[in-house]
Amino acid sequence: MLYYLFQYLDKYFDFPGAGVFQYITFRSALAIIMSLLISTIFGKRVISYLSRLQVGETVRELGLEGQTQKAGTPTMGGLIIIFSTLLPVLLLAKLNNIYIILLIVTTIWMGAIGFLDDYIKIFKKDKAGLKGIFKVIGQVGLGLIVGTTLYFHQDVTIRENISKNKIEVYSTQKGANTLSSDKKSTATTIPFFKNNEFDYAELLAWTGDGYRNYAWLIFIPIVIFIITAVSNGANLTDGIDGLAAGTSAISVIAIGVFTFVSGNVIFSNYLNIMFIPNSGEMTVFIAAFVGALIGFLWYNSYPAAVFMGDTGSLTIGGIIAVLAIAVRKEMLIPVFCGIFLAENLSVVLQVSYFKYTKKRFGEGRRIFLMSPLHHHYQKKGYHESKIVTRFWIVGILLAIVSIVTLKLR
């Protein structure tokens, strides 16, 4: 909204300083400051309000050190993250940008699913929360919306250096002119390879001519799978104070780097990566999101004054998934979201091995002392602050590795 206001003032009144709102970098800086202030100031009031409503966490007895002290800690703190992200975005971003629209829909959609889950747990006294099938239906529904929009919407394109269709001439960093064309594509990026583009449509090449017309049959299910997997991974990671918020902020910063360079024709040309028109605007959303996560971490760090609940964790996972897909970096998710992957795998391996050994030997055996992975280290006697700090360090290393793939091939 402020973007359009200052655009109007600059155009018709030549208002001093109004032109800076045209720059993504300025609006991104403003967004992170604004969201950080909102989450820290507004967050304190939300926590007090949740405490008065007695919206407290019900802790299951798992035999973990310090677990009983967490009982009654306000939950649903994800509302702080959602509000602190959306308000700066609504004020500073271009609201007619298809990527911004998708991210706003994702935030509200996944936030609603998480809120219902937390509401049922707290007010209906049902520890199971929202039934798993309904969560999956919600995640699949969002995947259908995102996948269909990214595949069919005319503003979702990539630019390649060819001389057909919509030809444009733009200046490269060295001043030379290059012929280019915006086109619809299901291409993505494969890390560590020199010619690192892969088109999902190629998976249907065996069907004969015209296979590209049916690429949506591959692309949309992949989008659904990624959104479901990453949102569940974030949900599993939210187990100890500050873990999910901190690791998510690190992952989102890495995606922010990808988004900025992929949406900038000069940087994308220099790095020889896919240029994605209109995607640079997502940097404003990412900045607001990072600020909201850091501001929330102010209250969620050990000892936590508030938990994000499924309201926050499902929203975080959904946003990260959509960002990665939109910027064509979903194949890097196992790297910059390596913590989510490890948490997910620890649960899958634990459950699968337990069932297998119970069937074969008559008693279930475990790989880890407890899953998800962070509980394994708690059982080994590590304090949760040490676990969180070390997971953050690993997350930073993974984020750096993922960014390095821009040049290392």
UniProtKB/Swiss-Prot annotation:
It comes from the Bacteria. The keyword Repeat does not apply. Its EC number is 2.7.8.13. Its cofactor is Mg(2+). Belongs to the glycosyltransferase 4 family. MraY subfamily. Pfam families: Glycos_transf_4, MraY_sig1. GO terms for cellular component: plasma membrane. It is an enzyme of class 2 (transferase). It is found in: Cell inner membrane. This is Phospho-N-acetylmuramoyl-pentapeptide-transferase. It catalyses: UDP-N-acetyl-alpha-D-muramoyl-L-alanyl-gamma-D-glutamyl-meso-2,6-diaminopimeloyl-D-alanyl-D-alanine + di-trans,octa-cis-undecaprenyl phosphate = di-trans,octa-cis-undecaprenyl diphospho-N-acetyl-alpha-D-muramoyl-L-alanyl-D-glutamyl-meso-2,6-diaminopimeloyl-D-alanyl-D-alanine + UMP. PANTHER family: PHOSPHO-N-ACETYLMURAMOYL-PENTAPEPTIDE-TRANSFERASE, PHOSPHO-N-ACETYLMURAMOYL-PENTAPEPTIDE-TRANSFERASE HOMOLOG. It is a multi-pass membrane protein. InterPro entries: Glycosyl_transferase_4, PNAcMuramoyl-5peptid_Trfase, PNAcMuramoyl-5peptid_Trfase_CS. The gene is mraY. The chain crosses the membrane at residues 23-43, 73-93, 95-115, 132-152, 214-234, 247-267, 279-299, 305-325, 331-351, 386-406. PROSITE patterns: MRAY_1, MRAY_2.
